[in-house]
């Protein structure tokens, strides 16, 4: 499993780093926006 940040721009997700995948690999993408990420991080006890 890989977690990669991306920017949504002009209807396209642009990855901020390359994925280590073979050509034609099928993947499932779960989208978590910045607001939700902040909620998750704020709710954690460190």
Curated annotation (Swiss-Prot):
- Give the domain of life: Archaea
Q: Which InterPro entries match?
A: AF2212-like, AF2212-like_dom_sf
| Claim: Kinase is one of the keywords in the record | no
The record's section on SUPFAM superfamilies has: AF2212/PG0164-like
Supply the alphabetized keyword list. Toxin-antitoxin system
Chain segments annotated as transmembrane: none
The cross-references to Gene3D superfamilies, in alphabetical order and at most eight, read: AF2212/PG0164-like (4.10.1150.10)
Please give the family membership noted in the entry: Belongs to the UPF0165 family.
* Job of this protein: Possibly the antitoxin component of a type II toxin-antitoxin (TA) system. Its cognate toxin is VapC3 (Potential).
Its recorded name reads: Putative antitoxin VapB3
């Amino acid at each position: 499993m890989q977690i990669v940040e991306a920017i949504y721009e002009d209807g396209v997700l642009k990855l901020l780093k390359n994925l280590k995948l073979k050509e034609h690999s099928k993947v499932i993408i779960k989208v978590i926006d910045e607001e939700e990420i902040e909620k998750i991080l704020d709710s954690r006890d460190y």
